[in-house]
Structure formats: structure tokens, C-alpha cells
Regions:
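Non-ligating segments of multi-cofactor redox enzymes
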Residues: 1-213
Length: 213
């Protein structure tokens, strides 16, 4: 009986140790894992982050939230941006200023506004101008970049009565989008926004980049 108990304990330990070491740095990063601006490359970020929560406390919009299992076991309680809750304020550098370990670099305002933490994608099946032919310019209005990362393609469509109308359909410029998330936060399609941010295109990763032809 003792031998069987010992074998079970040993086998459990052998399985458990590798599981604790699994993190997104060793596999494809998850789209919802949007790290604060100035965050180091994921493996080094997780090594340095002590999960103190200081960055989350100072976040002006409350957008920085604790990660659960999105970053593996190692990443539990590390910060990630959840645009549905709050966006990354364009000129804010507080998270890097309070980070005690350098997991999030201290950035000047000028440096921060050039950092990409993700990329916006439009779901045309939910976007009001695309799906319903209804006028909506909310995402473009709130885009904070000096040259708007969201622009409009004007398209003429037919209405139900056989008439024609012109609708402005939003388009994301991936070169200008910094992934701040204000477009997702402000989108009037509330249950599941028609424009959403993923971690694709983040400045800190050479691997997590969209294929733009």
C-alpha cells in the first residue's frame, strides 16, 4: 500500500512540475493577453513581475486587470488590459512609473504614444455601418492618434425600399493603430463590441505580428 502511495505521489510530482513551467512565452501568445505599454518580452516580463498590483491600482480607467490563466500558471495575477472595462489612456505612463522591478519600463509620454500594445480588428458582422447600413463614427471620433488610425471607406448601398444611400464604413490602419482599446470601450454594440483589440502587432514581440501583405 505504501509503495502504491509513493508511486502516485512521485508521478503526480513529475506531471505537476512541467505544468508549472508552461507559459505563453513557450507557445502562441493568446489574443486577449494585452500587456501594459512598456512591458518587456513575455518571458522576461513574467520573470520580473512580482504581481504586486501597483500598476492596476494607478490605472486611470481601471482597464488593467489581473490575469487568471490567460498567461499560464506563471502569469496568474499579472496585469493585462481588458478594453471592455477600460482603455489605455493615450498620454498616461503611470503603470511604468510605479512598477518596482522594471517588468514595465518607465516611458516618457513621447515614447509611450509610439508603443503598440495590440491592434484593433473590425467584426463586419456586428459593425453597424457594415451589417445594418446604419451611420456610426464612434470609433473614429475617439481614436487618439494624431493621424487617425481609423478612417472611412464611403460605400453606396441599397436600402429596403429600393433606394440608394451612402454609408461610411470604418477601416483600421495597422501602421497607426497602437491598440489602446478606446474604440472597443466606446463601441455602442455593447454585448460584444464590433471592434475589438488583440495583442497582435505589439511592439515588444517580434513573433506576435499580423501578416500584412
Amino acid at each position: 500500500m505504501r509503495k502504491r502511495t509513493l508511486l502516485i505521489s512521485l508521478s503526480s510530482g513529475i506531471v505537476a512540475v512541467p505544468l508549472l513551467r508552461i507559459s505563453p512565452s513557450e507557445k502562441t501568445l493568446k489574443p486577449e493577453l494585452i500587456r501594459p505599454p512598456g512591458s518587456l518580452e513575455e518571458k522576461e516580463f513574467l520573470r520580473r513581475c512580482v504581481k504586486c498590483g501597483e500598476c492596476m491600482k494607478v490605472c486611470l480607467t481601471n482597464g488593467l486587470q489581473p490575469t487568471l490563466f490567460e498567461a499560464g500558471v506563471e502569469g496568474i495575477w499579472s496585469p493585462r488590459l481588458v478594453p471592455l472595462i477600460g482603455y489605455c489612456s493615450y498620454n498616461c505612463t503611470l503603470c511604468g512609473q510605479v512598477c518596482p522591478t522594471g517588468a514595465i519600463k518607465k516611458l516618457s509620454t513621447g515614447e509611450k504614444t509610439k508603443v503598440k500594445i495590440g491592434l484593433a480588428f473590425i467584426d463586419q458582422s456586428r459593425c453597424l455601418p457594415y451589417a445594418f447600413g446604419k451611420s456610426c463614427i464612434v470609433c473614429e471620433e475617439h481614436c487618439p492618434t494624431p493621424k487617425k488610425a481609423i478612417w472611412f471607406h464611403e460605400k453606396e448601398i441599397g436600402d429596403r425600399g429600393g433606394g440608394r444611400l451612402s454609408v461610411k464604413q470604418p477601416v483600421v490602419d495597422p501602421e497607426l493603430c497602437i491598440g489602446c482599446g478606446i474604440c472597443e470601450y466606446k463601441c455602442p454594440v455593447k454585448d460584444l463590441p464590433a471592434i475589438r483589440i488583440t495583442s497582435a502587432g505589439e511592439s515588444r514581440s517580434k513573433v506576435n505580428q499580423p501578416l500584412l501583405v
